[in-house]
A protein has these predicted regions:
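Flexible glycine-rich surface loops and low-complexity tracts that mediate binding to linear polymers
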Residues: 55-64, 143-161
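N-terminal post-signal-peptidase region of extra-cytosolic proteins
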Residues: 37-47
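N-terminal accessory interaction module
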Residues: 111-156
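A surface/extracellular/periplasmic glyco- and lipid-processing/surface-interacting theme
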Residues: 70, 79-98
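Structural detector for short beta-strands of small beta-barrel domains
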Residues: 8-28, 89-117
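Bacterial Sec-dependent N-terminal signal peptides
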Residues: 1-9
């Protein structure tokens, strides 16, 4: 049964969230968003996502009308119904894009890049997930990112904030 919040229709519903996020080409920049097979949720207020877990959530879905970026709903977490760790064999595909914006911005304090090097083989991607690059892929990875070219890779989960590249598509 819908409820109304400040004249806008809100619905309480149960949704699933996949154990990974994906790179979305947003209006003026790229970002990581949730993958939900049964909702349009890309971000959920008050939800603390960890990589490598399937989630079932109870959320409030607030209809806000069509925004310029295509967004129609806002989501806020009411309850985590379940949080299930993936098996060690799960592999997922993700696009890695080294550029945050479609055109480089020359403004001070703006980071044009999505990758920050943490050590010789680990990078922080979009300030959200650490990516381990095994030695056999480092040359390919550096060539692509130095030339500001994205690539698709297959990844495994290491822990709630780290993934490992296992193959290149």
């Amino acid at each position: 049964m819908p409820i109304f919040v400040f004249g806008q229709q809100a619905v309480v519903k149960k949704i699933k969230i996949e154990p990974y996020m994906y790179t979305q080409n947003y209006e003026h920049f790229k970002r990581l968003v949730f993958e939900s097979p049964d909702s349009e949720a890309e971000y959920i207020d008050r939800f603390n996502f960890e990589w490598g877990y399937y989630y079932t959530l109870r959320v409030k879905e607030l209809e806000i009308g069509q925004l310029s970026d295509g967004t129609r709903y806002e989501y806020s977490l009411l309850k985590v119904i379940s949080k299930e760790k993936v098996s060690d064999t799960v592999i997922f595909r993700m696009f890695i894009d080294p550029l945050r914006y479609y055109h480089k911005l020359e403004e001070e304090g703006i980071s044009n890049y999505t990758l920050s090097q943490l050590n010789d083989s680990t990078y922080l991607y979009m300030d959200k997930v650490e990516i381990e690059i095994p030695h056999k892929f480092l040359e390919y990875f550096r060539k692509k990112t130095n030339n500001e070219i994205g690539f698709i890779g297959n990844f495994k989960f290491v822990n709630g904030k780290r993934i490992r590249l296992v193959s290149i598509r």
